[in-house]
Amino acid sequence: MNKKLFYLCYVADKNDKMLVLDYKHFKQFATKENYQEITCHITNNINNILSRHQQFSVFVNMKGLTISEIEKHQHFIQAISVYLKDRYPNMLEKCYIMNAPFVFSQIFNIVSMFIDKTTQSKIEVIAKKDIK
């Protein structure tokens, strides 16, 4: 397995139900040509968690994300969001988003109006001031 792909998405401990997604590694690895490989890797990790747990959590580190990168990967972000929502309904326990750039927070505030209340309650954007 490609080392960058491993660090892009991994489970910290085999008994854990926390999936870690790190934008730093996504940025180095992701291209339109390997979006399918990334989706399969994320799906495999979620399936491994769900073989031991009824739900999974996600920790997303967005450090280094820029508006141009959001635009560059917009179609992938939309496609994988819909895919995961449809494939794993009601299986997300919690989603923690850390190091989100200011622009993400502004976009999320607008987009969250279109996300159902149950899903909204599962998403927590961790402010930089709250990181110890």
Positions of PLM-derived features:
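SEC14/CRAL-TRIO lipid-binding/transfer domains and related phosphoinositide-recognition modules
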Residues: M1-N90, K94, M98, F102-K132
